[in-house]
Amino acid sequence: MTANQTKKSVPSFTSDIRQGVSNEGCLVLYSGGQDSATCLAWALEHFDRVETIGFDYGQRHKVELECRENLKQKLIQNFPDWAAHLGEDHMLDLAVLHQVSDCALTRETEIAFGEDGIPNSFVPGRNLLFFTFAATIAYRRGLRHIVGGMCETDYSGYPDCRDDTIKALQVAINLGLERRLVLHTPLMWLDKASTWQMAEEVGGKELVEIIRQESHSCYLGEREILHDWGYGCGHCPACELRAAGWESYQKSRS
């Protein structure tokens, strides 16, 4: 098997994780979006103790934060074995990001791409801060593993979603805390179709349906229109990416 095939193979990756850390605890960066919801389910399947952390950073729409709680409750109701492993939720106020960031996720600005190819939905430093605060909570809670839904395959040009960024951040965090925390990004080499597939492998069609209906990706906060792939405006980059992934996922199953 080539290195590229290994990166894109969900079964081989999940098997490797299952061997080493299932008896430990982790902290999941959980926003209520498709990626973080998939990572939460993945963590509940692979770790004995799972806590979550979310951030209110002055987003244009609070819909994702509302979906965050609804989706978690659906997981608790439909997956009682997971519910036994789900612990405390930590919600942090990072309103300072709204003060220092002028982007389409924190301002009423039309989504567009800059000359460098990075969309103006990029919040500079967001994931750097998220992981740093998560590491602080993990340190205090005695959790060695932190799970995030960053993805380089579908990362829309966000530099803080790159594998190199996360690896460098892990080194910096461990030096600064004098710990050996592990930053897990199980979606890093998966496209959106493979992310849907991963959800099915972790929790079956029931989990896929929960993520489809309860998670939120739309940059415009649209929750009135239910498409085959979930709620959203259908036109923003996040909706287009999610829709294309769903279509590819469905084709792979036929």
From Swiss-Prot:
InterPro entries attached to this UniProt entry: QueC, Rossmann-like_a/b/a_fold
Pathway: Purine metabolism; 7-cyano-7-deazaguanine biosynthesis
Catalytic activity: 7-carboxy-7-deazaguanine + NH4(+) + ATP = 7-cyano-7-deazaguanine + ADP + phosphate + H2O + H(+)
Pfam family, one: QueC
GO terms (BP aspect): queuosine biosynthetic process
Stated family: Belongs to the QueC family.
Note describing how the cofactor binds: Binds 1 zinc ion per subunit.
NCBIfam families xref list: 7-cyano-7-deazaguanine synthase QueC (TIGR00364)
Binding site for ATP: 30-40
Protein's name in the database: 7-cyano-7-deazaguanine synthase
HAMAP family in UniProt: QueC
Keyword Nucleotide-binding applies: yes
EC nos: 6.3.4.20
Alphabetical keyword list: ATP-binding, Ligase, Metal-binding, Nucleotide-binding, Queuosine biosynthesis, Zinc
Molecular function as annotated in GO: ATP binding; ligase activity, forming carbon-nitrogen bonds; zinc ion binding
CDD domains linked: QueC-like
Function comment: Catalyzes the ATP-dependent conversion of 7-carboxy-7-deazaguanine (CDG) to 7-cyano-7-deazaguanine (preQ(0)).
Enzyme class: ligase
The keyword Oxidoreductase belongs to this UniProt entry's keyword annotation: no
SS bond partners: none
Essential cofactor(s): Zn(2+)
UniProt-annotated binding residues for Zn(2+): 218, 233, 236, 239
